[in-house]
């Protein structure tokens, strides 16, 4: 598995692409890259995306049937769920060390352990990735 083959993509990028009527160009670029590359995500990603979709429905931004439509769009992409879950000790220690949530650390560790770039709109996660030698799929402003 090489960086040229794939990337770790967090829920912020996917939700920015799915939910926005005019998606951020970085989100569109990352998702278009999945035509030729794969995305690797932690199990947590599925919960975060589902919750983001639920929040959009609950806020009246999208009707309930869009959840299935969005899921159908995502199923067309090569999004792979990592089968290795970091141990509680490692997640907790890294979260304290980095000053991030354990949720964000799961993406950071996945990118670091697999040698893949990270796609995120989370500024703190991006800064920590950069400072710990994890490449970013794109730079955010």
Map each language-model feature to its residues.
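Short beta-strand scaffold positions
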Residues: 9, 41, 102-105, 120
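Alpha-helix capping/helix-boundary segments
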Residues: 13, 45, 86-87, 107, ...
């Amino acid at each position: 598995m090489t960086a040229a083959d794939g990337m770790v993509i967090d829920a912020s990028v996917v939700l920015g692409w799915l939910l926005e009527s005019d998606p951020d160009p970085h989100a569109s670029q990352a998702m278009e890259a999945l035509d030729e590359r794969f995305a690797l995500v932690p199990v947590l990603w599925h919960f975060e995306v589902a919750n983001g979709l639920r929040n959009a429905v609950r806020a009246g931004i999208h009707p309930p049937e869009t959840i299935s439509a969005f899921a159908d769009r995502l199923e067309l992409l090569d999004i792979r769920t990592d089968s290795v879950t970091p141990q509680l000790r490692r997640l907790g220690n890294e979260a304290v060390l980095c000053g991030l949530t354990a949720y964000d650390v799961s993406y950071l560790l996945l990118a670091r352990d697999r040698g893949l770039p990270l796609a995120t709109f989370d500024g703190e996660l991006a800064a920590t990735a950069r400072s710990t030698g994890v490449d970013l799929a794109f730079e955010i402003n």
